[in-house]
From Swiss-Prot:
Assembly description: Homotrimer.
Keywords recorded for this protein, A-Z: Hydrolase, Nucleotide metabolism, Nucleotide-binding
Identification of the protein by name: dCTP deaminase, dUMP-forming
Catalytic reaction list: dCTP + 2 H2O = dUMP + NH4(+) + diphosphate
Length: 180
């Protein structure tokens, strides 16, 4: 079941859903708006990115006020908010329609597991033929929360739990990709 604004506020007030910093006006009728943090990560260099060897050639940058995402550019960004989901709530990350109408695609693989905590790393892609300027602290995406039908056997304890700042791919840590 998708959570309403009342349920979202109730979970935050009880301390079961943690959002830091929390801005009450960002609770919408069925979602919570999250803001853009101050870090981006750019993939640089040439050649193949080998998923077994980890991410090389990633440059993490901090910005004060804004940055421009160039046409057809892909980069990682992070939310300003650090969130902590209770073990019975999952969330979907959705881009804001107003930004999508500019050609900005916002993802994070779209899913936040129950029990996750950390800042959310976002994948941004500018499909426009013009640069798009994004500002630190602007509302960038929204979380849609859903209550699980029953408690999970195990909550999220993966490689991104507790992440702060923009975090590049850690796919090389997946069990099936580890070198023998």
């Amino acid at each position: 079941m998708i959570l309403s604004d009342r349920s979202i506020r109730e979970l935050i007030e009880k301390g079961e859903l943690k959002v830091e910093p929390y801005e009450p006006s960002h609770v919408q009728c069925s979602s919570l708006d999250l803001r853009l943090g101050n870090q981006i990560a750019l993939y640089e260099g040439e050649g193949v990115i080998d998923v077994k060897k980890g991410t090389k050639g990633v440059r993490i940058l901090e910005f004060e006020e804004y940055f421009d995402i160039m046409p057809k550019q892909f980069l990682l960004a992070t939310t300003l908010e650090y969130i902590s989901l209770p073990p019975y709530v999952t969330a979907f990350v959705e881009g804001r329609s107003s930004l999508g109408r500019l050609g900005l695609f916002i993802e994070n693989a779209g899913w936040v597991d129950a029990g996750f905590e950390g800042q959310i790393t976002l994948e941004l892609f500018n499909a426009n033929d013009r640069p798009i300027r994004l500002y630190r602290g602007m509302r960038i995406c929204q979380l849609v929360f859903a209550r699980l039908d029953r408690p999970p056997e195990r909550v999220y304890s993966g490689k991104y739990k507790g992440q702060k700042g923009v975090v590049p791919s850690r796919i090389h840590m997946d069990e099936e990709l580890k070198s023998e």
